[in-house]
Amino acid sequence: MKKTITVVTGGHGGMGKAICKELGKTSAIVLAGRNLAKMETAKAELDELGVESYCCKTDIADRAQVQALAEYAASLGKVMQVIHTSGVSPSDTATENIIRINAVGTVNMVEAFYPVLDEGGVMINFSSVAAYTMPQTDEWTQAFEAWSEPDFYDRLLVLAGEAEDEESEFFRAGLAYAMSKKFIIYFTQKNVARFAEKHCRILSISPGCYLTPMHQKLIDNQPETAENQLELIPAGRWGHPYEMGALTAFLCSAEAGYVNGVDILADGGQNAGIFVPQI
């Protein structure tokens, strides 16, 4: 009998690691990402918990590497869960990389894992609350529809360059980030029917602010910014990575078998608090 395999991109990160620990209770884990040293550290933690795990160095922006990851995972057993958390933000890198990793990388992941996902499998792509901060324009939709075209990346790059403050690279990167995360929701929903033909599900999660090591740096280095951010969250606190692990595990379970083609906004009420007048 083949073992059950769960692939987690970005599994060495705060939320990714929590997801690995939760799903690792019933499945072997394949950690995928660019930083092999961090993945091996995460693997050591999983080993201590008795979780069977593997590491596969992968740049998700590289189609060939993602294809190799999918083939490797399939060689280990039945690929039942693919959790794609990898991504970059404006504070990490430039506009070009945001589009290449977040948008093109998601296309690569879906296209590579659709053929190997076993019957009854689930794929979850991670978007962000940032996807809800800007409306999807007709120009964005037209660019999104070109996801399979050779100039897809270039189209998104052009749209990011049309930011009002073109002199600010950070502003361009911020626009590219919101656009790339909105694309993740769009592309996830665009794949629902074909995944259903295999009796598989595909959905997305949009996290708000979670107390990951990266977010802790913001709190430590920019306390005023963090305080202002916290004031926007009706829950009055940051999310905890273990909560994301539990949510992801539920969405992968049979009990969530009718949850499909939807984005789960897990932001402590932040989006509603900002955009809907409160009582």
Predicted regions and their residues:
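Catalytic loop of short-chain dehydrogenase/reductase
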Residues: 90-92, 122-197, 209
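Short, small/polar-rich loop/turn modules that mediate ligand/substrate recognition or access, typified
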Residues: 201, 259-261
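Rossmann-fold cofactor-recognition segment
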Residues: 46-64
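Conserved glycine-rich Rossmann-like NAD(P)H-binding loop of the short-chain dehydrogenase/reductase
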Residues: 27-41
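Conserved glycine-rich cofactor-binding loop
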Residues: 12-13
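Conserved NAD(P)H cofactor-binding loop of Rossmann-fold oxidoreductase domains
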Residues: 83-90, 269
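A conserved structural motif in NAD(P)-dependent oxidoreductases
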Residues: 233-244
